[in-house]
């Protein structure tokens, strides 16, 4: 459940799609601005910016928004964002990693801590959770990319480490330093990915169900709704039956 695709599908079924899309565009814009500010403003010469722009396009973000986010980085009045990682535990002992981009460290920390506390979790110290995870490349395709066998064959050919497929699509995992190379090979074979990023992958999953699963969903939803938060990862293992029950 590291990418929370099933969580997101449930949230969208609950009628949150429009608000979630607006929030998503805001987060994508922030990543583009930070990427452009930390390197060259040309995606062809800035790998991080290239990935940020690709991810924005995959989410159908308008070109004007993308260009505006890049130009914002070149302005003298552009905000200075700090990248911060928070780690904690949710209901059922589930590990949670939160990545933030913020222009106010104190505000972000207070808000993230409050969200954990209000939703059955607790914020931990640095590396209280991350030591149980690997930092890897993650490439996500929808089910339209092809069958599990087709994607697996393309991933092996591209040099990927692992593939996970389900009804929501395909997640391809790569070594940290092989992401760009594998992503380019997969694009040639399968077309543009829905998302390409450096991500956290848990070494072991934590089963969770019932009330703990319901509260965990609220925790992750609240974290993802927080303006300063860019990505949320958990090692929750929730069965498909449990997720459908929670969605009803």
Swiss-Prot record:
This protein's GO CC annotations: cytosol
Gene Ontology terms, MF aspect: DNA binding
Keywords: Cytoplasm, DNA-binding, Transcription, Transcription regulation
Gene3D superfamilies xrefs: 1.10.10.200, 3.30.70.980
SUPFAM superfamilies noted in UniProt: YebC-like
GO biological process: regulation of DNA-templated transcription
InterPro entries per UniProt: Integrase-like_N, TACO1_YebC-like_2nd/3rd_dom, TACO1_YebC_N, Transcrip_reg_TACO1-like, Transcrip_reg_TACO1-like_dom3, YebC-like
Chief subcellular location: cytoplasm
UniProt entry tagged with the keyword Protein biosynthesis: no
Superkingdom in the source lineage: Bacteria
Cellular localisation: Cytoplasm
Pfam families for this protein: TACO1_YebC_N, Transcrip_reg
HAMAP family: Transcrip_reg_TACO1 (MF_00693)
Similarity comment text for this entry: Belongs to the TACO1 family.
Name of the protein in its database record: Probable transcriptional regulatory protein PHZ_c3068
């Amino acid at each position: 459940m590291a990418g929370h695709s099933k969580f997101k599908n449930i949230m969208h079924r609950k009628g949150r799609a429009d608000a979630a899309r607006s929030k998503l565009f805001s987060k994508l814009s922030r990543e583009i601005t930070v990427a452009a500010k930390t390197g060259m403003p040309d995606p062809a010469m800035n790998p991080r910016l290239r990935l940020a722009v690709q991810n924005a396009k995959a989410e159908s973000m308008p070109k004007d928004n993308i260009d505006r986010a890049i130009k914002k980085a070149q302005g003298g009045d552009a905000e200075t964002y700090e990248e911060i990682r928070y780690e904690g535990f949710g209901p059922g002992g589930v590990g949670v990693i939160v990545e933030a981009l913020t222009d106010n460290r104190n505000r972000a920390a207070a808000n993230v801590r409050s969200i954990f506390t209000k939703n059955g979790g607790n914020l931990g110290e640095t590396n209280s959770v991350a030591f149980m995870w690997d930092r890897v490349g993650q490439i996500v395709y929808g089910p339209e990319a092809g069958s599990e066998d087709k994607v697996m064959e393309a991933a092996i050919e591209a040099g990927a480490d692992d593939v996970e497929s389900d009804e929501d699509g395909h997640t391809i995992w790569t070594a940290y330093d092989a992401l760009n190379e594998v992503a380019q090979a997969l694009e040639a074979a399968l077309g543009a990915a829905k998302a390409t990023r450096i991500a956290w992958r848990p070494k072991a999953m934590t089963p969770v169900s019932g009330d703990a699963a319901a509260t965990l969903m609220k925790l992750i939803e609240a974290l993802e709704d927080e303006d300063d938060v860019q990505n949320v990862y958990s090692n929750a293992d929730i069965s498909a039956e449990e997720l459908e029950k929670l969605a009803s």
